[in-house]
Amino acid sequence: MACVLAIGSILFVWILGKGKYSGAQLIYRMATNFAISQGCCLVTCACELTEEIKHLHTRYNGHYWRALKASFNLSCAAFVTAILCYVFYEPKLMASLPLTIDITLTLLSWLFCWILGIQGPTPATISEITEIKQLNVAHGLAWSYYVGYLQFVLPALKESIQKFNEENHNLLKFPETCRLHILIPLSCRLYGDLKDVDENITFLKEIPPLYIDRAGIKGRVFKNNVYRILDEDGRPYNCIVEYATPLASLLKMTDIPSAAFSADDRLQQTKLFYRTLKDILENAHELQNTYRLIVYEDFPETKDHSRHLLSQEILKHIRQQHSEEYSML
């Protein structure tokens, strides 16, 4: 359809301008219109860059070059055209054209951009559209995790902890430990036992399971585990910890060629999963003080990376919650 419109526009300009304007004048005007339109796009991209810089660490890991590439999608053809217009400028080329021809030439320049793929949405714009319209993989995973799991488990957590404490001498006696601590590693690597990744974390016990009839399964079981975590001085802390299981899907997608899902895509989707889940839970006011999201980087770039990263991250959040509880008293 774009090619048909382009051919029609060329014929229209040729009919109206035949014998009145030279081909050089018409081409020069179309080139200047193209350069001006690309200049407007350049300003728009600069505005997008200022917005992306605000999210430099959450979206691009602090890399300015990645933010720059995501914000700009201009072809070198725009700059070459602008230079050629300047080099070959002559007053006679800037003829005063009728409004109909001028508008048609402007339309024609946009059509050529579209046909040749010179102008298109930037990666940042595409990301914004898919995020707003909830077209990302992460949105579906976050909502599925909430409506299919957290929406059942979190409201019942308080009662399950009470039963657990009655049977186990109040092992979870502090408010900051009576929450479900959800681990969100940016690498998406999940382990069956947390001790496999950090020897300062050991499985202690299960809290009483939750049974729900769901999706044709009678008495479907939802379990949560209590882990004992040792700090740097060997002092024990007990809390309920588990991974956000949908992250395993993101990791598997990277290994499936047909998914066309790169490691960078996985990282961006993991961050979006966290932001989406955070928004969902914050809007579920009845679930306040029943969970804690722990997002952390677990792909070390240096050899002196701590072997106790996970226990340190969990303890940091437990202490933060303790100070928050204390400040509210």
From Swiss-Prot:
It comes from Xenopus tropicalis (Western clawed frog). The lineage of its organism: Eukaryota, Metazoa, Chordata, Craniata, Vertebrata. It holds the Pfam family STING_LBD. The keyword Membrane applies. The keyword Endoplasmic reticulum applies. This is Stimulator of interferon genes protein. Residues 1-4, 53-74, 117-329 are cytoplasmic. Belongs to the STING family. GO terms for cellular component: autophagosome membrane; cytoplasm; cytoplasmic vesicle; endoplasmic reticulum membrane; endoplasmic reticulum-Golgi intermediate compartment membrane; Golgi membrane; perinuclear region of cytoplasm. It catalyses: H(+)(in) = H(+)(out). Sensor of cytosolic DNA from bacteria and viruses that promotes autophagy. Acts by recognizing and binding cyclic GMP-AMP (cGAMP), a messenger produced by CGAS in response to DNA in the cytosol. Exhibits guanine base-specific ligand recognition: binds 3'-3'linked cGAMP, 2'-3' linked cGAMP and 3'-3' linked c-di-GMP with much greater affinity as compared to 3'-3' linked c-di-AMP. Following cGAMP-binding, promotes the formation of autophagosomes, leading to target cytosolic DNA for degradation by the lysosome. Its main location: endoplasmic reticulum. It is found in: Endoplasmic reticulum membrane; Cytoplasm, Perinuclear region; Endoplasmic reticulum-Golgi intermediate compartment membrane; Golgi apparatus membrane. The chain crosses the membrane at residues 5-25, 27-52, 75-88, 99-116. GO terms for biological process: activation of innate immune response; autophagosome assembly; cGAS/STING signaling pathway; defense response to virus; innate immune response; positive regulation of interferon-beta production; positive regulation of macroautophagy; positive regulation of type I interferon production. Disulfide bonds: none annotated. InterPro entries: STING, STING_C_chordates, STING_C_sf, STING_LBD, STING_TM. In absence of cGAMP, the transmembrane and cytoplasmic regions interact to form an integrated, domain-swapped dimeric assembly. In absence of cyclic nucleotide (c-di-GMP or cGAMP), the protein is autoinhibited by an intramolecular interaction between the cyclic dinucleotide-binding domain (CBD) and the C-terminal tail (CTT). Following cGAMP-binding, the cyclic dinucleotide-binding domain (CBD) is closed, leading to a 180 degrees rotation of the CBD domain relative to the transmembrane domain.
